[in-house]
C-alpha cells in the first residue's frame, strides 16, 4: 500500500518541513529508521499530554479550589473524588448514597472512575487525578493509533488527534477521552469492513457517553 507523505501532500506541512531539511525526496527510504509513523505519533501524544498536564500545574500545587478558573486548570476529576464518595470507597451506582452524590456519568465511565479510585491511595485527591491522567493518556493513545489505522495510506492524519489543542487543554477536565477512544476504534473497524465489531465498540462508546449515538444515523445511511 502506498503511504501518502504529508510533506508532499500538504502545503502547510511542506513549508514547515523546511526547518528539518524540506519535503521528503524521491529517494527517501521509508521504514529505514527506528522512528516509524506509529512511534512518532506516540511521542507526539505523550508530549501533548505532558503539556496538558503542566497546564494544570497551578491547581496541582495550590489545590483545586480557589483560582481554578482564573488559572485555567479546572477539572471535574478532583472534586468528584470526594463529592461522589469515591474517596470513602463508594462503588458507583451500587453504594447507598444520597441522590446528589450519585455519579452522573454513564455506566462504563463509572467503571473507569471506580478503577481509578481503586488504584488511588485512600483519600489522596492529587493521586486520583494523576491516576486518571495516566488512564486517559492510554485512551488518547488508543484513539490516535485507531485513527492512523482507519486509513492506512494516510496514517499521519492521526497527528491531528495527537496534537489537538482541544484535547491538550481539556482532555483531563473529565473522562470524555474514554468514549473518544472507543468510537475511534469503532470507526477503524468499520473502515476495514468489520461491522459487527464496529457495532460492539460503538455500543461500548454509548455506554461511556451518549454522544456516540449520533453515529448511528450515518451508519444506517451507509448500510441502506
Identify the residue ranges that each predicted region occupies.
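Transmembrane helix irregularities
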Residues: 190, 204-211
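Perimembrane helix-loop-helix junctions
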Residues: 214-224
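Transmembrane-helix signature of polytopic, membrane-embedded enzymes
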Residues: 145-164, 197
Amino acid at each position: 500500500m502506498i503511504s501518502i507523505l504529508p510533506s508532499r501532500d500538504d502545503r502547510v506541512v511542506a513549508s514547515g518541513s523546511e526547518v528539518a531539511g524540506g519535503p521528503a525526496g524521491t529517494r527517501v527510504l521509508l521504514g529505514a529508521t527506528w522512528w516509524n509513523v506509529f512511534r512518532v505519533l506516540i511521542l507526539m501524544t505523550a508530549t501533548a499530554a505532558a503539556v496538558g498536564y503542566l497546564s494544570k500545574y497551578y491547581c496541582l500545587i495550590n489545590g483545586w479550589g480557589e483560582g481554578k478558573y482564573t488559572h485555567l486548570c479546572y477539572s471535574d476529576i478532583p472534586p468528584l473524588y470526594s463529592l461522589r464518595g469515591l474517596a470513602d470507597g463508594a462503588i458507583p451506582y451500587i453504594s447507598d448514597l444520597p441522590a446528589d452524590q450519585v455519579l452522573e456519568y454513564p455506566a462504563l465511565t463509572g467503571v473507569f472512575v471506580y478503577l481509578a479510585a481503586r488504584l488511588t491511595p485512600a483519600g489522596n485527591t492529587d493521586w486520583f487525578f494523576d491516576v486518571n491522567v495516566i488512564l486517559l493518556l492510554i485512551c488518547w493513545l488508543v484513539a490516535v493509533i485507531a485513527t492512523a489505522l482507519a486509513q492506512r495510506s494516510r496514517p499521519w492524519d492521526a497527528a491531528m488527534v495527537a496534537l489537538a489543542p482541544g484535547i491538550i487543554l481539556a482532555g483531563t477536565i473529565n473522562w470524555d477521552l474514554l468514549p473518544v477512544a472507543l468510537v475511534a476504534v469503532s470507526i477503524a473497524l468499520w473502515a476495514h469492513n468489520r461491522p459487527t465489531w464496529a457495532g460492539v465498540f460503538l455500543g461500548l462508546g454509548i455506554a461511556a457517553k451518549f454522544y456516540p449515538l449520533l453515529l448511528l444515523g450515518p451508519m444506517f445511511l451507509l448500510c441502506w
